[in-house]
Amino acid sequence: MCNTNMSVSTGGAVSTSQIPASEQETLVRPKPLLLKLLKSVGAQKDTYTMKEVIFYLGQYIMTKRLYDEKQQHIVYCSNDLLGDLFGVPSFSVKEHRKIYTMIYRNLVVVNQHEPSDSGTSVSENSCHREGGSDQKDPVQELQEEKPSSSDLISRPSTSSRRRTISETEEHADDLPGERQRKRHKSDSISLSFDESLALCVIREICCERSSSSESTGTPSNPDLDAGVSEHSGDWLDQDSVSDQFSVEFEVESLDSEDYSLSEEGQELSDEDDEVYRVTVYQAGESDTDSFEEDPEISLADYWKCTSCNEMNPPLPPHCNRCWALRENWLPEDKGKIPEKATPENSTQVEEGFDVPDCKKAAASDSRESCAEEIDDKITQASHSQESEDYSQPSTSNSIIYSSQEDVKEFEREETQDKEEIVESSFPLNAIEPCVICQGRPKNGCIVHGKTGHLMACFTCAKKLKKRNKPCPVCRQPIQMIVLTYFP
């Protein structure tokens, strides 16, 4: 008899290497329910080998088409005799241990010394050999042979995949040299659920004939000597020809070496890896200004349109719904601003005219008069300081400090007045007013980097810079404020 081996797979399939050789060659008698299932697909005996049980079980699944059309490794047997036999509504062909256990529960070991069973087995084996070629010729095909158990033990990290052509030994009385040569070849019977896809294939591989069987001259049939296939679930663990690929991997550790395809002679190198560097830039500005995400603008800053009662953001002068101009967006009386901005001695300047061109005196005259008054005050303070140095030496220092502070305050007020005069000298019809104070023209350019925004007056822009506020338009930090002159 031929020794059959079921290799140990990574998925945990049952290995016949752990089962005694006598048990592998033992005939089994299916239980009544399993026997009924086997006879429905052509079985005619009462005792079978494990190979024959798997063969007829595959024929039953193929005939009834119990497998899923899309995921064909799944077998549905809830409303079938197979479901009553296994006790499960469905199972996967990749669960080798589970399938072997379900089959083995429905078998009874038969003593080989019984003459009736052995004679029946021999007669049925001969009949099976005669009809074996007709039964398997339509479905024979090239398939990949998985490594034997000895190969898996010696090389657990690699899987050799070879293609073998099914062949049958026609002459039992070959020469010893030919038999020695043929015993290294494997005979495979391929029966698939779907012949077009070659899915769920039943493979029965005849193992090497032992030297003891050759010495004793035990007759062997190559079609029936292959007891149980390499894996107990290999008859259900085959994918379609297009889906045949290995999914072998190992858990990587510090001591593990680089993975290489030794069978194909290909090695993975660093050149095969492609590294892409992606840089993400955040947009600084957009075409449309949004005030909804601005934390400094609250609902109290929104203005209500008098025409349609729509609440609008503070900066746009027009209503977003009806496009009406905001009420009091521009001052009604345009002559009030220059009157407020002119100094006290502006009445005297307006009354005087130049003789040649009959024009009003320029603002430079007022500046000169202010400068003369400052000089007079400074000289008076110096004279009073000298006189008091002799009379009251104890209070001279306080007088000096007070006079200097008065001069500094006066100069500060004068510069502010000059800035207001310059700002108010622009015609309001030429430019829009400041969006912050709504009174002075937009002449304070907020500069940040190489760009700037002209949206406020010089005074309001300086206040923003002094308080370390960002630009109201683009939210960038303010670097400087530039006073802008218009022609």
From Swiss-Prot:
Q: Which residues carry this modification: Phosphothreonine?
A: 415
Composition-biased stretches (Acidic residues)? 252-274
- Keyword Cytoplasm included in the entry's annotation: yes
The record, for InterPro entries, names:
Mdm2, MDM2_mRING-HC-C2H2C4, p53_neg-reg_MDM_2/4, SWIB_MDM2_dom_sf, SWIB_MDM2_domain, Znf_RanBP2, Znf_RanBP2_sf, Znf_RING
Query: Where does the record place the region Sufficient to promote the mitochondrial pathway of apoptosis?
Result: 1-101
For the keyword Transferase, the answer is yes
Q: Where is this motif: Nucleolar localization signal?
A: 462-469
EC main class here is: transferase
Question: What GO terms in the biological process aspect are recorded for it?
Answer: apoptotic process; negative regulation of apoptotic process; positive regulation of mitotic cell cycle; protein ubiquitination; regulation of biological quality; ubiquitin-dependent protein catabolic process
Q: Where is this region: Interaction with MTBP?
A: 170-306
Family, per the entry?
A: Belongs to the MDM2/MDM4 family.
Q: What is known of its domains?
A: Region I is sufficient for binding p53 and inhibiting its G1 arrest and apoptosis functions. It also binds p73 and E2F1. Region II contains most of a central acidic region required for interaction with ribosomal protein L5 and a putative C4-type zinc finger. The RING finger domain which coordinates two molecules of zinc interacts specifically with RNA whether or not zinc is present and mediates the heterooligomerization with MDM4. It is also essential for its ubiquitin ligase E3 activity toward p53 and itself. Interacts with IGF1R.
Quote the PANTHER family the UniProt record gives.
Answer: E3 UBIQUITIN-PROTEIN LIGASE MDM2, OS05G0521000 PROTEIN
The name on file for this protein is: E3 ubiquitin-protein ligase Mdm2
| Gene name tied to this protein | MDM2
